[in-house]
């Protein structure tokens, strides 16, 4: 029992206590309601959207958000359209892409921080940034993946991808049921659109994104190619 929902999967955080937040609680509610099934939930391309006006950051509101999401999961399940699927209707297509690293990242500076052994190197994400640059220099590519199941397509995208990528994917194949899972390979961190890097904001700022505005052209092309494969 798969479900997909695009939003930042957070209500309140930085408590030092691990928890699945409201999407995990909603998934557990569905497990209780349908014990014979295993609910598996994916967060969609929710890099630049959140619970918005429905979330005031209060601990009490986490349950309310979980109940709303669980209700959406229930209604989606009850309105499932079933179709027979043969082995030939199942596909797994991979499109490796080289996402452009952000220009503000300097490998020499990050290497120097590593050599000095500063505690903040790992705590502030510099270790992840250095690993990303090393991967890029080595020619490592990120796999963009599409699972085909009959008339359904499920895309798996890297990082905290902006919702525009999900909307573009659905618009590219209105004849199919298209679902999107984000938060895959997290090396890029936030993945914005080209214009978003011009507009500013936290998500596309140097502390938050490891890729540049050219990422939109690369990722959109991969999405279109994957969705056009097959019937």
Describe the role of every protein-language-model region.
Residues 1-231:
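Non-catalytic substrate/cofactor recognition surfaces at enzyme active-site rims
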